[in-house]
Amino acid sequence: SIQASETFNGHTYALTSAAMTWAQAKVIATALGGYLTTINTKAENDWLTAIFRIPYGHSWIGANDIATTNTWVWDNGTTDNDNGLTDNICGSNGCPNSNATWADNITRKWNNGEPNYSGGSCGYIWKTSGTWDDVACSNNKYAIIEFD
């Protein structure tokens, strides 16, 4: 189930009421008619970080490369015309020089050197910085669910 529902730019966001795996979060999001959040702009990322990070810690977002390793996409299927979340220069050593940008031409929020593929195919947002990292999908975290 969900808690802490908030609205930004015409979309509603809710946080799961418990920490869970990425797959469990995806099932709940789908059952509720939503999806794990797709972050389209720096403003949205900053807002999500401010609203959800302090009380709940690191939280799952929709970023993943489950279907194809090194090809990051969003849970709702969008790819943003840039191989999802990176600028196509990712390799087995991660994306240390990724300069992929949002629609507002501001560099995406991957933490430096991330995603680094150290056993992680699911993305989460860091509670302190709002940057993203990849980690094993079997970890337990709260999840941010987005509704159109």
Regions found by a protein language model. Give the residues of each.
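Extracellular, disulfide-bonded carbohydrate-recognition/adhesion ectodomains
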Residues: 1-148
